């Protein structure tokens, strides 16, 4: 491949920060919706599954509707991934946030079972289907867009900002539900209070749409289109054939990221209440505080990944959880509240290493002309199989074995596999150009360096197989 210095991408670091905010809004909205739904399952069950007498079964049906969203994510990943690789990243990100906002608003407006009968749960299910479908193209698109718009030397530190949106969305949901339950009676919450957060989600979506409409297309995508007119000539089977190793590493990385993520954010609150016997308010405050502390930790580890390489930060997380997961769950069974807090915050500490590195690292595993669709499909299949099922698997393990430490064994096993795969198969790409692309630089000094060292600028040429 001939080197053309004119194709080196000069990017503005300040604009890159704005792209993080605009794309992070989508993450915030996704997790705000997830958090609100999780916190209001009892009210949703009472409104949409009222003929069911058992509260436990109503809750199961409510969670089943939530699980449907995960099953639709891979389909959304395929559709939006193909569109994103062919027509651009921006068009998808603009579309997904509209669909997400609409589905969230719909849930808040739906009549109850007592008003329209069986249509109520059916419409709830359809709203969750739309949410899952749109989310399937959202996160992979956000990661891709930020990675392609950031200077290579700051890709992880800027990418970690996406997870700030994730954490902020969940924190906002927790705080809003806490305020509503404080100011409203239980009857008012069951009647109309639970709907308020879903209705307010519309404004978050409109704000995100406003920001995203002002975005420009990523420089990497524009450069790729300009230099490779016949770029979209490979199908999924060929992608798997040529890049199965990269797909496998990405799949495993998403597994250990999401199993840890859902273990801490989705399962741990239930574990603390049902097994450890903490009250709901204390549990909510603890989990919210953990996520708040993870925000500066994620930013710190993102900067560290740019300096020492994301592979080493991955290994800090997987290695740490290999050693600490069982200890952490043992600490949760302590009679000391302080010791319990240490166990929870320890899990959050190691999770923050993933929050910091995943957004900036996963897009680097694939070439520009196949990046969106391959990342989107791989990410969403992995999340659907392992991420969304984590609370269910953890609950089943405790019930089946009778061992309250069973979830820790599961987390340890996943972490060991992740540690081995990253150690032996992952190549650190921190500071390097994205595969299939010329370098992204934000100063003339870096540009001059790559002009003098073209082989380092196009380090990926020898690896490309299609």
From Swiss-Prot:
This is Putative proline/betaine transporter. One of its GO terms (molecular function) is symporter activity. Belongs to the major facilitator superfamily. Metabolite:H+ Symporter (MHS) family (TC 2.A.1.6) family. It comes from the Bacteria. May be a proton symporter involved in the uptake of osmolytes such as proline and glycine betaine. The gene is proP. The chain crosses the membrane at residues 20-42, 63-83, 91-111, 116-136, 164-184, 191-211, 247-267, 285-305, 313-332, 337-356, 379-399, 405-425. Keywords: Cell membrane, Membrane, Symport, Transmembrane, Transmembrane helix, Transport. It is found in: Cell membrane. SUPFAM superfamilies: MFS general substrate transporter. It is a multi-pass membrane protein. One of its GO terms (cellular component) is plasma membrane. Pfam families: MFS_1.
């Amino acid at each position: 491949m001939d080197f053309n210095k004119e194709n080196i991408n000069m990017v503005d670091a300040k604009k890159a920060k704005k792209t993080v905010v605009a794309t992070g809004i989508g993450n915030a909205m996704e997790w705000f919706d997830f958090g609100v739904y999780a916190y209001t399952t009892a009210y949703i069950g009472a409104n949409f599954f009222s003929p069911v007498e058992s509260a436990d079964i109503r809750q199961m049906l409510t969670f089943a509707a939530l699980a449907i969203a995960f099953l639709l994510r891979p389909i959304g990943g395929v559709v939006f991934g193909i569109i994103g690789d062919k027509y651009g990243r921006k068009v998808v990100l603009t579309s997904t946030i509209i669909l997400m906002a609409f589905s969230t608003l719909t849930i808040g407006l739906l009549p109850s079972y007592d008003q329209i009968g069986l249509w109520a749960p059916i419409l709830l299910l359809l709203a969750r289907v739309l949410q899952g479908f749109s989310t399937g193209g959202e996160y992979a698109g956000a990661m891709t867009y930020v990675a392609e718009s950031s200077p290579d030397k700051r890709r992880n530190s800027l990418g970690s900002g996406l997870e700030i949106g994730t954490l902020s969305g969940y924190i906002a949901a927790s705080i809003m539900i806490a305020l509503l339950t404080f100011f409203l009676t239980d009857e008012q919450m069951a009647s109309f209070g639970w709907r308020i957060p879903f209705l307010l989600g519309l404004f978050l979506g409109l704000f995100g749409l406003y920001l995203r409409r002002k975005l420009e297309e990523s420089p990497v995508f524009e450069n790729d289109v300009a230099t490779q007119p016949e770029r979209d000539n490979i199908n999924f089977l060929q992608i798997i054939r040529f890049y199965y190793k990269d797909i496998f590493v990405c799949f495993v990385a998403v597994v250990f990221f999401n199993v840890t993520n859902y273990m801490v954010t989705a399962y741990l609150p239930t574990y603390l209440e049902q097994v450890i016997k903490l009250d709901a308010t204390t549990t909510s405050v603890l989990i919210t505080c953990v996520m708040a502390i993870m925000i500066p930790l994620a930013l710190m580890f993102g900067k560290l990944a740019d300096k020492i390489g994301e592979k080493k930060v991955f290994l800090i997380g997987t290695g740490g959880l290999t050693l600490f997961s069982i200890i952490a769950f043992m600490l949760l069974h302590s009679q000391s509240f302080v010791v319990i807090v240490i166990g929870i915050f320890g899990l959050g500490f190691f999770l923050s290493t993933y929050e910091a590195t995943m957004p900036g690292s996963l897009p680097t595993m694939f070439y520009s002309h196949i990046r969106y669709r391959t990342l989107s499909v791989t990410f969403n299949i992995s999340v659907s199989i392992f991420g969304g099922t984590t609370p269910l698997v953890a609950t089943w393990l405790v019930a089946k074995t009778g061992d309250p430490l069973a979830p820790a064994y599961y987390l340890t096993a996943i972490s060991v596999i992740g540690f081995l795969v990253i150690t032996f198969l992952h190549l650190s790409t921190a500071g390097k150009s994205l595969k299939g692309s010329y370098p992204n630089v934000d100063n003339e000094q870096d540009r001059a360096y790559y002009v003098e060292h073209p082989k380092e600028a196009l380090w990926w040429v020898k690896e490309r197989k299609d």
